């Protein structure tokens, strides 16, 4: 049941990707290459929709298309990586800052008495 709901949730993004693929297959080859970005705007849109979903993917694609103007130099502009969720980031920070004692390791906490002697 859950997989059916997930498939329905992804359906609008998949439909949009299908339309972009039609453009890339039938329209784009008839035109001169004009995209000043790498990856191209259509590749960017497909990647954004696949990795970030419909709402965020459309937002990222709209920002990318807005950059397609004479005043923007273009160049390498990949889909940004996802930021860790707040809970995940807090857990990672806590794990990194938690005191730990590795016997005889340079990672041992200052003032730690876990030197192997009893």
UniProtKB/Swiss-Prot annotation:
GO cellular component: plasma membrane
InterPro entries: Membr_insert_effic_factor_YidD
Chief site of localization: membrane
Keywords, in A-Z order: Cell membrane, Membrane
Keyword Disulfide bond: no
Domain of life: Bacteria
Region described as Disordered: 76-118
Biological role: Could be involved in insertion of integral membrane proteins into the membrane.
Family named by the database record: Belongs to the UPF0161 family.
Name of the protein in its database record: Putative membrane protein insertion efficiency factor
